[in-house]
Amino acid sequence: MDGKNCSSVNEFLLVGISNKPGVKVTLFITFLIVYLIILVANLGMIILIRMDSQLHTPMYFFLSHLSFSDARYSTAVGPRMLVGFIAKNKSIPFYSCAMQWLVFCTFVDSECLLLAVMAFDRYKAISHPLLYTVSMSSRVCSLLMAGVYLVGIMDASVNTILTFRLCFCESNVINHFFCDVPPLLLLSCSDTQVNELVIFTIFGFIELITLSGLFVSYCYIILAVRKINSAEGRFKAFSTCTSHLTAVAIFQGTMLFMYFRPSSSYSLDQDKIISLFYSLVIPMLNPLIYSLRNKDVKEALKKLKNKKWFH
């Protein structure tokens, strides 16, 4: 494209979820409640794990980082979306838009890989229980998390640089409630083929690593569970994985549908609904899944409830 037609954009206008005045108040109250639940539940989970020594294990170390990722990427999107319901000015500065996407992408990618790491942790706990604390030492856990966050930051940085160096010369109106890449690519008047190829390749690689890790880990888990003689022992061993499997099914199902659906079926309205689900609904569900189905967490909550805070 001719460079003289490429004018700089200082801000974008976020259309939001709905422009209907009668619906805005209802949506604002609904998503304010959802966002508060996300903060209370995920930060509460982190605090609970830190306070209860019984939860100072690799499994709950990774769970605390899952809660941190949920709280972080939902916070990148939630407050700005809530402001959009009540503010007349729906603009977001160019660099704020870039930062929003950078933070969001970093922690979504991190959560994607973290779910595979958590499956590996379950494999170690079930297949090699006697060596579990040695093989999953605090140093190993910290290195795994460092790798997870490093990949997330690298992918998000590449995505952000490639997207926000494009030309936006015809319109600055984003038909979305946050600065997501697909609507930005549609908005650009530059050739976006390289962006689409790089984004698809990197995210596809991350998904391949994640799904391969999940598949291999659970194959070994199933083999280990089958070797347990008693039915009660098999049930107890596999029950530790049910919360994780539920979280994986919801998160990965949404991600795969979002980024690997046929281009012919793509629509921005559908995109907004799916984005809403994985940016706010999933972070609300994860702590509920892990607390309602987890005996250790429920026991820790009970101890916290019965603790005498004032003497």
UniProtKB/Swiss-Prot annotation:
What function does this protein fulfil? Answer: Putative odorant or sperm cell receptor.
Segments on the Extracellular face: 1-25, 80-100, 159-196, 261-272
The text of the family note is: Belongs to the G-protein coupled receptor 1 family.
Look up the domain of life of the source.
Eukaryota
Gene Ontology cellular-component terms for this entry are: plasma membrane
What protein name is recorded for this chain?
A: Olfactory receptor-like protein OLF2
Cytoplasmic topological intervals: 50-57, 121-139, 220-236, 293-311
